């Protein structure tokens, strides 16, 4: 299954705010109206919607998300929390959280087009897993820096999560540590996502 490229507002109206997909927000009360039209949600649908929320926010295919769930299931600790850490530490998401891109698809384009370096080397793989002490910089070329500066100027000022530091004038971000669960930028019940996949096998 490919990445979603359809109308974004349609998705947030059904699933709620997806900041990685779009900065738009659902209208107040739209969730209640949708729920009243469709009646009480089944447990399956609740789990499915949480899974879809995660997939659309991070811009993943179904196969990619399943792969992350399997990796998280083999790791030590809570599968749900490990899953969120894996997704949050992707390079495209780190750029988004730093404010160098307005959405994760936009961050993915920056990476794909070779504008981003990690520890001094160009990385063109959006799924690259960042680690503590990684230094993310914009390529030292005018078109790359102008592009990112425009995005930084356009992004709404938000407090950075504790695991990241941004040096705006150096076009540089630093990964301080693995993200803490409370700093995840999406309202999600990750346990329902894990439960969804456990019932598919």
UniProtKB/Swiss-Prot annotation:
Pfam families: Ribosomal_S4 (PF00163), S4 (PF01479). It is found in: Plastid, Chloroplast. Residues 89-152 form the S4 RNA-binding domain. Disulfide bonds: none annotated. InterPro entries: Ribosomal_uS4 (IPR022801), Ribosomal_uS4_bac-type (IPR005709), Ribosomal_uS4_CS (IPR018079), Ribosomal_uS4_N (IPR001912), S4_RNA-bd (IPR002942), S4_RNA-bd_sf (IPR036986). It comes from the Eukaryota. The keyword DNA-binding does not apply. GO terms for biological process: ribosomal small subunit biogenesis; translation. Residues 20-44 are annotated as: Disordered. GO terms for molecular function: rRNA binding; structural constituent of ribosome. SMART domains: Ribosomal_S4, S4. One of its GO terms (cellular component) is small ribosomal subunit. Belongs to the universal ribosomal protein uS4 family. One of the primary rRNA binding proteins, it binds directly to 16S rRNA where it nucleates assembly of the body of the 30S subunit. HAMAP family: Ribosomal_uS4_B. Part of the 30S ribosomal subunit. Contacts protein S5. The interaction surface between S4 and S5 is involved in control of translational fidelity. NCBIfam families: PRK05327.1 (NF003717), rpsD_bact (TIGR01017). This is Small ribosomal subunit protein uS4c. It comes from Aethionema cordifolium (Lebanon stonecress).
């Amino acid at each position: 299954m490919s990445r979603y490229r359809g109308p974004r507002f349609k998705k947030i109206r059904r699933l709620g705010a997806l900041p990685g997909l779009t900065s738009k927000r659902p209208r107040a009360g739209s969730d209640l109206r949708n729920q009243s039209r469709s009646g009480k949600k089944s447990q399956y649908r609740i789990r499915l919607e949480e899974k879809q929320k995660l997939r659309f926010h991070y811009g993943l295919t179904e196969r990619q998300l399943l792969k992350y769930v399997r990796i998280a299931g083999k790791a030590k600790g809570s599968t749900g929390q490990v899953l969120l850490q894996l997704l949050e530490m992707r390079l495209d998401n780190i750029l988004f959280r730093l404010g160098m891109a307005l959405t994760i698809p936009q961050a993915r384009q920056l990476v794909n087009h070779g504008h981003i370096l990690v520890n001094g080397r160009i990385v063109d793989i959006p799924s690259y897993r960042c680690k503590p002490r990684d230094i993310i910089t914009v390529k030292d070329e005018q078109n790359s820096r102008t592009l990112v500066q425009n995005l930084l100027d356009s992004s709404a000022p938000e407090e950075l999560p504790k695991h990241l530091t941004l040096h705006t004038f150096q076009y540089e971000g630093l990964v301080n540590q693995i993200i803490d669960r409370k700093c995840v930028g999406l309202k999600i019940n990750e346990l329902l996502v894990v439960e969804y996949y456990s019932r598919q096998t």
